[in-house]
Amino acid sequence: MNNLQTHISSYLEYCLAQKRLDEKTIKAYRIDLIQFYNEISISDPCKIASYDLEKYIEKMHLKYKPKSVRRKIASIKAFFHYLEYKNIILQNPFNKIQIHFREPVILPKTIPLYIVEKFLFTIYKQRSAAKTNYQKRNALRDAAIVELLFSTGIRISELCNLKISDVNLIDGVILIYGKGSKERILQIGNSSVLNILKEYKNDFYNEIVQCNHFFSSQSGKPLSDQSVRRMINKYASLSSIDLHITPHMFRHTFATSLLEADVDIRYIQEMLGHSSINITQIYTHVAVSKQKDILINKHPRKDFHF
């Protein structure tokens, strides 16, 4: 049966089983493709022409921001490549469409380093001032999480998905399964970070084994993205920090700090798990303070004397 809805279901199963995409990506694909199916009003994919796609894209531009439209088009385009690959359609209507975007560059938001230090200080202070063992253990785990976010640039989804077998604290190495099931290895280069992770693992060992995730609640359940976000908000409030801090901002700060320290951008790309260096290059626009330092201290005009 050549039904668009049936092919969408088959494609999502293919993405899960063959392409091994993560649940969040598949969820986004599902939303985009079901929306497309509901709007297009054509049940047979063979009858969808370039004109139909162009009209649909025009409608999306009226409803969504360019970034959202780009993502939705990418979802639909990947689906039609699948239909072509499976010989379900003879011609891909996307082949006759030229899509151009001019998006404003949105720079990653970073956390000033003095605020990162203040944030970490607050967590350690809460731990030392804890009145109950429960509070003390929570603060220990929270310190381990924030230290890892800042010291490795790991994504929050990657952190929450870490298994006990992915973390080798003897050698200070973490195996990360990133976007698209891409593997990368990260080193823990700071001894203080390594020590707090070891202390956390020893204290939470039973809970970690119980849920098979490295970061666990005290009831032995894996930590969710949302629970980490709530924890970040809690310590930002306790620190009296007048800045909305998200877990991903630690990743941006990690990358920008390394770039400002003259680390080769290709090393940063590898550590962040970016598929293209073009993605990493966004951080070159952020390092304004480094640019100023270079122009003050490196430009030859400073040696001119009249």
From Swiss-Prot:
Keywords: Cell cycle, Cell division, Chromosome partition, Cytoplasm, DNA integration, DNA recombination, DNA-binding. Pfam families: Phage_int_SAM_1 (PF02899), Phage_integrase (PF00589). InterPro entries: CB, DNA_brk_join_enz, Integrase-like_cat_sf, Integrase_catalytic, Integrase_recombinase_N, Integrase_SAM-like_N, Tyrosine_recombinase_XerCD. GO terms for molecular function: DNA binding. SUPFAM superfamilies: DNA breaking-rejoining enzymes (SSF56349). GO terms for cellular component: cytoplasm. Residues 2-84 form the Core-binding (CB) domain. Its main location: cytoplasm. It is found in: Cytoplasm. The active site is at residues 155, 179, 248, 251, 274, 283. Residues 106-296 form the Tyr recombinase domain. GO terms for biological process: cell division; chromosome segregation; DNA integration; DNA recombination. Site-specific tyrosine recombinase, which acts by catalyzing the cutting and rejoining of the recombining DNA molecules. Belongs to the 'phage' integrase family. This is Tyrosine recombinase EUBREC_2677. It comes from Agathobacter rectalis (strain ATCC 33656 / DSM 3377 / JCM 17463 / KCTC 5835 / VPI 0990) (Eubacterium rectale).
